[in-house]
Swiss-Prot record:
InterPro entries: MetalPrtase_cat_dom_sf_prd, YbeY, YbeY_CS. GO terms for molecular function: metalloendopeptidase activity; RNA endonuclease activity; zinc ion binding. Belongs to the endoribonuclease YbeY family. Its cofactor is Zn(2+). NCBIfam families: rRNA maturation RNase YbeY. GO terms for cellular component: cytoplasm. It comes from the Bacteria. Coiled coil: none annotated. It is found in: Cytoplasm. This is Endoribonuclease YbeY. Binds 1 zinc ion. Zn(2+) binds at residues 131, 135, 141. One of its GO terms (biological process) is rRNA processing. It comes from Agathobacter rectalis (strain ATCC 33656 / DSM 3377 / JCM 17463 / KCTC 5835 / VPI 0990) (Eubacterium rectale).
């Protein structure tokens, strides 16, 4: 697995955010039984940075906690059967890894929401990465049944890591 973190801002967390991020990405890949080596990019920004991206790509004029930019298109969430070694577009030509996509997190929102929801910054950070990884696997939460499936996957991944509220 290749996992890259780009810091656009200082990350003054009281935990090893790089270690937590990598553990969450690995646990998500394992939970979904992802059949290939994967490449994931994480950008850590602030409310101003994520606001600009949210406005540009989603036409939503406000900051958000996390944005996900999947590189793959799924017919069924979590079904990787469409991936094939013959389809070179899905693989990084230098590493041979499947390019899953990009995760962008507002460090400001991690801190704000941890206080708002009454849990640790570590839990909020891990939750947002888990949530975004599921989007990179094709899951969504536009409908109630989709949201329930996503919430169950999130809970199982975080429980496996011992990261709870």
């Amino acid at each position: 697995m290749s996992f890259f973190i780009e810091k656009e801002v200082e990350c003054n967390f009281n935990f090893d955010y790089e270690k937590v991020a990598e553990a969450v990405v690995s646990a998500s890949l394992e939970h979904e039984n992802f059949p290939y080596e994967a490449e994931v990019n994480l950008t850590l920004t602030d409310n101003e940075g994520i606001h600009a991206i949210n406005k540009e790509y989603r036409q939503i004029d406000r900051p958000t906690d996390v944005l996900s930019f999947p590189m793959l298109s799924y017919e069924t969430p979590g079904d990787f059967s469409f991936l094939s070694d013959e389809n070179e577009d899905d693989f990084n030509p230098d590493t041979g890894e499947v390019m899953l996509g990009d995760i962008i997190i507002s460090v400001d929102k991690v801190k704000e929401q941890a206080v708002e929801y009454g849990h640790s910054e570590k839990r909020e950070f891990a939750f947002l990465i888990t949530h975004s990884m599921l989007h990179l696997f094709g899951y969504d939460h536009m409908e109630a049944d989709e949201a329930a499936v996503m919430e169950e996957h999130q809970r199982k991944i975080l429980d496996a890591l011992g990261i709870t509220r």
